[in-house]
Amino acid sequence: MTYQAEIDQMAQTISSQGSPWNAIDAESAARMKLQNRFRTGLDIAKYTAKIMREDMAAYDADPVNYTQSLGCWHGFIGQQKLISIKKHFGTTKRKYLYLSGWMVAALRSDFGPLPDQSMHEKTTVPALIEELYTFLKQADARELGMMFRDLDAAREAGNATEAKRIEHAIENYETHVVPIIADIDAGFGNPEATYLLAKKMIEAGACALQIENQVSDEKQCG
């Protein structure tokens, strides 16, 4: 959908609500919609899973099309990595984030630094996935906000050519949201517990899970 079509669609929605919505500016609302493209973690998981399937097919066709998964343990770290990658390479294509179990155990547990043996909190990794995507969505909102300001400046200057160029860039904007491969520890209980943890991670936005059991001994009752 074009930038103008987004505005027109929003104008129709506002008009259909009558006078209570009259103070809402259609273009401002359309911009907020573009800055908040992903509403839920499942929206992200579906979007990134499609990317990953395409990248796997591209690699099968030619191994030169490999992907790179960069480890991170904090939303800000992931955000700055993707901002830097996009600025340097001009794209985030075939660049993923990877959550390592040992890294999470060592750096993100409320109990402090721990070995990678199922000793950290069960929901630590899902919480980190959600945190990462919050920061990546913020990077999108910031960059699009700068583009909107540039568009307003071009219009005020009467530079129709520059305004059109910026509109085209907005319509073809590449998000900082990339696939996350998450290391899931199956050592927290039985198969159902592993299923529930995997479900939680997908709901947070992960599109690929690496499942392993790092427990050092048998969990027993009594």
Task: Give the ranges of each region predicted by the language model.
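Alpha/beta enzyme core
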Residues: 2-222
